[in-house]
């Protein structure tokens, strides 16, 4: 796990904290199922990932597909945002996240969906 958020992650985190007043609570860099998630809202089973240039390689893209499939089987939805989208239009990113949350009912947490010790990948 990184000690500090990247600038785009920090910018998104500030925006996500604004969603708390509407009852949406995100955790940052959460260790779950052997992975560190950039942000996760467990109640709504929503994962947010901030992707930089390293995610454009085929190897990393395959890793991301596998990871997303692992969480999809657990009932989680993953939204990925490019650094540039957060930098250039944070408002649109937050609006999209809010729209997804508002149209997704909260899901019950089961034992299998609770966090487990993470690992860096």
Identify the function of each model-found stretch:
Residues 1-110, 116-121:
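Nucleic-acid endo/exonuclease domains
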């Amino acid at each position: 796990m990184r000690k500090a958020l990247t600038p785009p992650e920090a910018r998104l985190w500030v925006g996500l904290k604004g969603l708390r007043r509407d009852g949406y609570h995100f955790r940052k860099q959460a260790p779950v199922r052997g992975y560190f998630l950039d942000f996760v809202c467990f109640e709504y089973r929503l994962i947010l990932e901030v992707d930089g240039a390293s995610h454009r390689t085929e190897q990393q893209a395959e890793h991301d597909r596998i990871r997303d499939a692992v969480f999809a089987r657990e009932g989680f939805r993953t939204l990925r945002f490019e650094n540039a989208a957060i930098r250039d239009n944070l408002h649109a990113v937050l609006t999209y996240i809010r729209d997804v949350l508002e149209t997704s009912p909260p899901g019950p947490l089961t034992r299998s969906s609770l966090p487990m010790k993470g690992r860096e990948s």
